[in-house]
Amino acid sequence: MKNTFLIEIETEELPPKSLKAIAQSFNKQIIEKSKTYYLKYKQTKWFATPRRIAVMILDINTSDTNFYLQTKGPSIKNAFDKLGNPTSIMKFWMQKMNIKIHEITYLNTNKGSWVTCSKITNKKSIQEILIELCRLAIKNISIPTFMKWSNNDIQFSRPVRNVIMLLNHEIIRNNVLGLETNRLLSGHKFMTNNKIILNHAYQYPELLLNSGKVIADYDARKHKIQKHASIAAQSVNGILKIKTTLLEEITALVEWPTILLATFKKRFLNLPQEILVHIIEKKQRCLPIYSTNNGTILNSFVVVSNIETSYPNNIVRGNERVIHAQFVDAEFFFKKDTKKKLIDYKPLLKKIIFHDTLGTLLDKTHRIKKLITWISKFTHANVNDCIRAADLSKCDLVTNMTFEFPECQGIIGMYYALHDLEPKNIAIAIKEQYQPKFSKDNLPSNTISYSLALADKIDTLTGLFSINKNYNISEKDPFSLRRLATGIMRIIIKKNIHINLYDLLEKSLKTYKKINNSDIILKKEIQFLFNRIYSIYDKNKYNHSIIKSILENNTKILTNIDPKIKAITYVFKNHPKILQNLIITQKRVSNILKQFKENISFNINMKTLEQIEEIKLIEQLNIIEKKYKHPFSKETYISMMLTLNSFCQLIHEFFNKVMINHKIVSIKNNRLAILFKIQNLFFTISNFSNININITI
């Protein structure tokens, strides 16, 4: 059997939402620190359950390790003469270091080359190395929050109850986190009583499985939950739509997952589906089952129990009772809330403070109405529907249902609006006003929805910047302004809203009373929003300089930024020489224009054209302008760049054969006007001169 090392840290219940990250961090630190000690092995494997994290190192080299100190000697130039013989300086250094000529090594750097020697400074046994390695790894585990216990200063995510360190059969004796290491395993908290003796490190997962009723392998446990829960759903002609975060959390809550099927009364299916799902998933950590026919929720759900028992019905009934009680509450709130119309809750918004300095939610509603009225011109949404959506947008925040289930704000408003027979698009807008909630969340689906979402987000951003224009979000972001700004930019860019960003922010500022230094606030907001554009595309590994080259010519109107970035990226990856030609040509045009500070008219006088090169140039220029008057898609921009690439040949011929700085001022100005027009044609896509094609996308 090959050499195996194991370290297990047994704790009290670890936080389920961070269990996987803690275990993976432990494994990562073991790998990183093993490099420091030149430890050779085949692979590592990590384990995690609610009450333990462990790392196993497989096929480990157990030989003692020599640690070397590298000493730098004289430079190569001073170490050897022209014949390659050691100089007196070199001989003195060799004598000092007590080494022979064959023992020297060489160090080559950008600053020069030197002779060096490596000498053994320390020899450590594998046991010593593993003790130090684990100490450093534990010290550097990434843990969200630490806690102390007992009367010592030791800190960990949760109190530590036992530590195992085994190299094959041998216990690595050490004090770890205040406890002496041993070979005693703890099995399942409820299904086993006695400690389990671990004779060999390699037996760890198998012994826990067979004797301890614990599936230590996190991924194996997760796979079992997925597989058996799906089988349970199929038994009632249903399917699961398991959210990744929920599956990870459930996996981190159980050591021995047992799948059970539970039900609730069909009458509760009349409640909003999102409320049912929220209660089942968030409140009870169970899995809702959906119909295979229409995707709606069924009156069955999956319970993932942490115990295998002879009386599973007791567990099922316990979960059903809890679910039933919460559904009854939701049913009561729904009936009570819908006794009056959603719009009738609007006056109550004056009792809810939006922000101490920014007024109430009723004040916010009035500002959103003013802003959405203006925004609707650019989103082509029905202005009356937009105003109605704004009036209703925050009304559900004062209902009983939202008070009980605050995570469902907007969703509840949508159902109440539909109950009041409001138009469907308006109801959907109430739900979607908070989208996108995270970087990859869906955008609002209709014009009213993204008009309302934009107005709501801009109002919040402007308000918070107005009370703190030096808002520091470098580390902490208590109001989630980064997420808010990302949502604003995604809506404008992805929905291709032809709106002036400066005007939008100015309109928002004017809806607030008594705002000072609005110019400073506006400047700060613009910079903040533009930084989010970089963030959006940087995450998808787009070239930073490409984004910058486009934004320089789109400081106010953000239309077509997305297809431009994707088009230039496509040409960059597939036709780099074409992009390089566009960059060189535009730089040449720009450099000439920089030499002339006069105000040159953009009007080209055709009568002043003298040479065939400038005539050909202006003819082709007019053709391209007409062809690409409204280039909106990625494909059109790619086509335009390929056309401009051919056009570059005429530009270079113009430069080579036509005197720009003509002695006759009218001719010179006319030729400069041609160059200005060419530059503006390039600017239709990007300021190519700012693109760094050496950066890897």
Swiss-Prot record:
The encoding gene: glyS
Protein's organism: Buchnera aphidicola subsp. Baizongia pistaciae (strain Bp)
PANTHER family: GLYCINE--TRNA LIGASE, CHLOROPLASTIC_MITOCHONDRIAL 2 (PTHR30075:SF2), GLYCYL-TRNA SYNTHETASE (PTHR30075)
The enzyme's E.C. designation: 6.1.1.14
Family recorded in the similarity comment: Belongs to the class-II aminoacyl-tRNA synthetase family.
Subunit structure, as described in the record: Tetramer of two alpha and two beta subunits.
Protein name: Glycine--tRNA ligase beta subunit
NCBIfam families: glyS
Key words of the record: Aminoacyl-tRNA synthetase, ATP-binding, Cytoplasm, Ligase, Nucleotide-binding, Protein biosynthesis
Recorded catalytic activity of this chain's protein: tRNA(Gly) + glycine + ATP = glycyl-tRNA(Gly) + AMP + diphosphate
UniProt xrefs under Pfam families: DALR_1, tRNA_synt_2f
